[in-house]
Amino acid sequence: MKRAGRTMVERTSKFLLIVAASVCFMLILYQYVGPGLSLGAPSGRPYAEEPDLFPTPDPHYVKKYYFPVRELERELAFDMKGEDVIVFLHIQKTGGTTFGRHLVQNVRLEVPCDCRPGQKKCTCYRPNRRETWLFSRFSTGWSCGLHADWTELTNCVPGVLGRRESAPNRTPRKFYYITLLRDPVSRYLSEWRHVQRGATWKTSLHMCDGRTPTPEELPSCYEGTDWSGCTLQEFMDCPYNLANNRQVRMLADLSLVGCYNMSFIPENKRAQILLESAKKNLKDMAFFGLTEFQRKTQYLFERTFNLKFIRPFMQYNSTRAGGVEVDNDTIRRIEELNDLDMQLYDYAKDLFQQRYQYKRQLERMEQRIKNREERLLHRSNEALPKEETEEQGRLPTEDYMSHIIEKW
């Protein structure tokens, strides 16, 4: 009887070794085959009452760019009680306001952000001390300037927090940059409508290499206080319009091209350097989401930082840009004006989809392995002789324990 039990344990051990080897093989295989493999669904996640909350991975997705597995995993050991800080780079008209509110109002935290009525900023302290873990518009305000870009934030954030939260002999902070991107045509039209209603970002600093640009380096598209009432044609005709390729400019290291000095290097070379810099910085960010994929954005953020949202994200397709009727010629013109953004978005969308595919499929594979182990354990328990099962499950009673003590 005992021999039969040992045989069953040996079989179980061999099976688990085979399963472990299979997992390693599948991870190696993914590197070459890509995310087309269908590997299964997540387990133990929130929103169990909504099994279809996150879209099923597309088994027919064809990737455009090659990314090694290390670029797809993106699971960080974010330590809110340590020195880690999330820095949100908010690009205009990408849905950043909604996402920023999610960060301060919708994350399940040990110590929730303190958001009081009538106040524009929330207090987001760490659970163990009065220091912020989030650098964003709705937590620290525009501390590095209105809609500060990558160049500004990376040079400004450490100093700002160092002055606000100085402490002797402290461990250096670790910054995790995040952002949202949007389809360039939709984003451009949304910005035009925003400007048409009288909005401006003229208080933005555009700080680069320790100074702001001169009026000659960054001319204005309009005279007066704002550009309200401008037509789409007027908006497109301004050669200095910062709406053109805004996403690339705000994600690139502008120091590489002489900041806003257009005569620093030839225009074609400048454009290529900016695009490659934006791609690199985006890829190296801790996380980025896409406005067009709210649920996938939520999913990737949660898995990257191991933080859960209280309420699921909603996908709103009826935006102001969506209500603008433009002909095909105008769309092509907008695409030309935003050619760098179009290339960046194509790159970002593919990386985003590959990360989503990878994480979802990995979770499904882990769930399959877990289910197999549970079935194997159940079968092994059923296979044990009845007497042995009863003997293993018998609990010592008080009389039985007294008998043992007396005998001893």
UniProtKB/Swiss-Prot annotation:
Q: Which residues lie on this side of the membrane: Cytoplasmic?
A: 8-14
Q: How is it modified after translation?
A: N-glycosylated.
| Entry keywords, A to Z | Coiled coil, Glycoprotein, Membrane, Signal-anchor, Transferase, Transmembrane, Transmembrane helix
Major location (coarse): membrane
Q: Which residues cross the membrane?
A: 15-35
InterPro entries tied to this protein: Heparan_SO4-6-sulfoTrfase, P-loop_NTPase, Sulfotransferase
Q: Provide the residue positions that the database annotates as binding 3'-phosphoadenylyl sulfate.
A: 90-98, 182, 190, 314-316, 320-321
Bilayer disposition of the protein: Single-pass type II membrane protein
Do the record's keywords include Electron transport? Answer: no
> Which GO MF term does the entry hold, naming one?
heparan sulfate 6-sulfotransferase activity
User: What subcellular locations does the record give?
Assistant: Membrane
Report residues binding substrate. 120-121, 137, 142, 147, 194, 201
Membrane side Lumenal: which residues? 36-408
Residues modified by carbohydrate are 261, 317, 328
- UniProt catalytic activity: alpha-D-glucosaminyl-[heparan sulfate](n) + 3'-phosphoadenylyl sulfate = 6-sulfo-alpha-D-glucosaminyl-[heparan sulfate](n) + adenosine 3',5'-bisphosphate + H(+)
A single GO CC term for this protein reads:
membrane
The catalytic residues are 147
Q: Name one GO biological process term.
A: limb development
Coiled coil residues, start to end:
348-382
Q: Identify the Pfam families for this entry.
A: Sulfotransfer_2
Its annotated function is as follows: 6-O-sulfation enzyme which catalyzes the transfer of sulfate from 3'-phosphoadenosine 5'-phosphosulfate (PAPS) to position 6 of the N-sulfoglucosamine residue (GlcNS) of heparan sulfate. May also play a role in limb development.
- According to its UniProt record, which protein family does this protein belong to? Belongs to the sulfotransferase 6 family.
Write down what this protein is called.
Heparan-sulfate 6-O-sulfotransferase 1
Species of origin reads Gallus gallus
* Gene that this polypeptide is encoded by: HS6ST1
